[in-house]
Design a protein with these regions (language model features):
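C-terminal motif of bacterial Sec signal peptides marking the signal peptidase cleavage site
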Residues: 14-17
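Hydrophobic beta-strand positions that form the internal "hydrophobic ladder"
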Residues: 73, 109, 160, 209-210, ...
Length: 328
């Protein structure tokens, strides 16, 4: 579900909402142990916290990425984090929270959202951080005050960008950034933006660089979101991620076809990446590239279809089909 939120005159954010639908809870089997280097990732997962599951369905996806301290692809859902790793699926044994604004980083993840029923947390969660796959959550800011549906965090810098939908004790409505784990915040002026914004992504190593996907293309800022320039024009861009060298974004062309494009920040060279055909009523909402392996990328759609490529987009395999977990 989406709804529109106005941000003064400069832009309009589309905020991904929550649903009351409950996801199917699959049976849990074996415990995940630390994994050796594999073709998709090469990190360490917390032992005895993630359990392998043999079936399941994701109702809504609230973020996707590669946490640097866990192997596999982490997917934030309405009821906790699920991880896809080499044809297998895992989920957390506890901490089944409704994570929103999920952002994977080198040392774990950042998120907001709502606690699971009965959990000893205030609602909403505010801004949280975890360095152990979600087993422990560190309260950074706005605990019990705000639910941030739109976050972007630098993979290595941990610079935080967020859109605050409603005023809280520190922030008015608007776009803000922090470079000290959410202790201090500065407002971004967003000069140069004039159309609907779908999402934004922070550069992994340069705190001042942030990209946004918008109604008329992709915009790029190098001064903490104070000024933006049109980086790539399209009919509409629905999702974006920034790597060290490229901006990778999903767009819709004049034929109403969805596509993914990789564009060099330094040279402006564009490469169109072939993707599987999608339903015209479905939309790419999240893209993530593996920071440890640039040939691997994953994207997720509004209807909870997730596709993975390990060869730079030459071939794809579907790992969820309208939310149903696929084992391949």
């Amino acid at each position: 579900m989406k709804h529109y939120v106005g941000l003064a005159i400069t832009s309009i954010f589309i905020i991904t909402g929550c649903s009351n639908n409950v996801e199917t809870q699959p049976a849990k089997t074996e415990t995940v142990q630390s994994q050796p280097k594999n073709k998709e990732t090469a990190n360490t997962i917390p032992q005895n916290f993630y359990k392998e599951i043999t079936s399941g369905k994701i109702a809504h996806i609230h973020g996707i990425g590669y946490a640097g301290n866990m192997p596999g692809i982490s997917i934030a859902t309405h009821s906790g984090i699920k991880v896809y790793q080499n044809g297998k699926w895992f989920e957390t044994a506890t901490q089944l929270h409704d994570y929103m604004g999920f952002q994977a980083t080198k040392n774990g993840f950042f998120a907001s959202g709502h606690p699971e029923p009965g959990a000893n947390f205030k609602n909403p969660l505010g801004l949280m951080k975890s360095s152990d796959g979600g087993n422990n959550l560190e309260k950074l800011a706005f605990y019990g005050e705000s639910d941030f549906h739109n976050l972007a965090v630098g993979y290595n810098t941990e610079a935080i960008y967020l859109y605050n939908e409603r005023p809280n004790s520190k922030l008015q409505q608007g776009f803000y950034f922090s470079t000290d784990n959410g202790q201090e915040w500065k407002n971004s002026k967003l000069k140069g933006l004039s159309s609907t914004i779908h999402s934004f992504s922070a550069h992994p190593d340069q705190s001042s660089v942030v990209a946004v996907s918008a109604k008329d293309g992709v915009y790029l800022s190098t001064d903490y979101g104070n000024t933006f320039e049109l980086f790539s024009k399209s009919v509409e861009s629905t999702a974006v991620t920034v790597s060290n060298e490229d901006v990778i974004y999903a767009s819709i062309n004049k034929q109403n076809e969805q596509m993914i494009t990789k564009k060099s920040i330094a040279t402006n060279e564009e490469t169109n990446i072939q993707i599987p055909s999608l339903d015209s009523k479905d939309t790419i909402m999240y893209i993530s590239q593996n920071p440890q392996n640039s040939s691997e990328m994953v994207f997720a759609t509004m209807k909870a279809n997730v596709f993975l490529s390990t060869d730079g987009g030459k071939t794809w395999k579907q790992i969820t089909k309208e939310g149903s977990l696929q084992y391949n």
